[in-house]
Amino acid sequence: MEVANKTQQKHFVLVHGAGHGAWCWYKLKLLLESSGHKVTAIDLATSGANPKRLDEVDTLKDYCSPLLELMAAIPQDDKVILVGHSYGGFCIALAMDLYPKKISIGVFVASVMPDSTHPPNYFINQYYKWNPVGEDSTDTKVETFGDPDQPRTVIHFGPIYLSTKLYQNCTSEEIELAKFLLRPLSVFSNDLSKLKAFSEEGYGSVRRGYIMCSEDKAVPAGLQHWLIENVGASEVKEIKGADHMPMISKPQELCQCLVEITEKVV
């Protein structure tokens, strides 16, 4: 892969999925930087090394606050490429809605990708339609806490679920790393149920790309195709042999897809 010069250099902002952190991008970050690009990988609230606890974060916006703070600090004449993985698709969609002029393209990787017609919760329901609760969930645990009238849900990915549904094409060492670093997660369903659709003038004005993973067992191929057909993306790529974690199982291929997408649109 050619090394980008200063005029070709792009700024990639990498946004992890639920339960993960900036750490999961360690291979891709090095590859993009080696190609001459600038990379920022962030820890969302309650994730990675972020000190927030789940009982301190109530909303999607709270969860995304590190990303939104980063976007607010970017100069008005600069543009970044947002890359959102899995649940991180909601996070980059929120940033695209609030800061559309600071974003060249939002790239969704094996991710939920909302539109500007339906509220976010609609896409959570679509996910469960394609991937029913309890189906192949193996040892993943779901707990509730807080107000009994509006309980908060916490999800703990179990080691069997990790190795068979998320990381099945990764090495045993990579799976062990994930077991050490993953944190309990929430999808903030109470908040999502109250949110309106992202706006057409904000989110809808930013180009979207989608990277499919052919062997993803967490976001099924049928759902990925449905999102592309019904929501739409100007650039679509597929990584053959990639599980739900292409940044770990297929980092070279993911890097190539991102570079090719951005070369077309930026």
From Swiss-Prot:
It holds the Pfam family Abhydrolase_6. Its EC number is 3.1.1.123. GO terms for biological process: alkaloid biosynthetic process; jasmonic acid metabolic process; salicylic acid metabolic process. Residues 11-121 form the AB hydrolase-1 domain. It catalyses: 17-dehydropreakuammicine + H2O = norfluorocurarine + methanol + CO2. The active site is at S86, D216, H244. One of its GO terms (molecular function) is methyl jasmonate esterase activity. Pathway: Alkaloid biosynthesis. It is an enzyme of class 3 (hydrolase). Keywords: Alkaloid metabolism, Hydrolase, Serine esterase. Gene3D superfamilies: alpha/beta hydrolase (3.40.50.1820). Hydrolase involved in the biosynthesis of curare monoterpene indole alkaloids (MIAs), natural products such as diaboline, a pharmacologically active compound used to regulate blood pressure. Curare alkaloids act as animal glycine receptor antagonists. Catalyzes the conversion of dehydropreakuammicine to norfluorocurarine. Homodimer. Belongs to the AB hydrolase superfamily. This is Norfluorocurarine synthase 2. The gene is NS2.
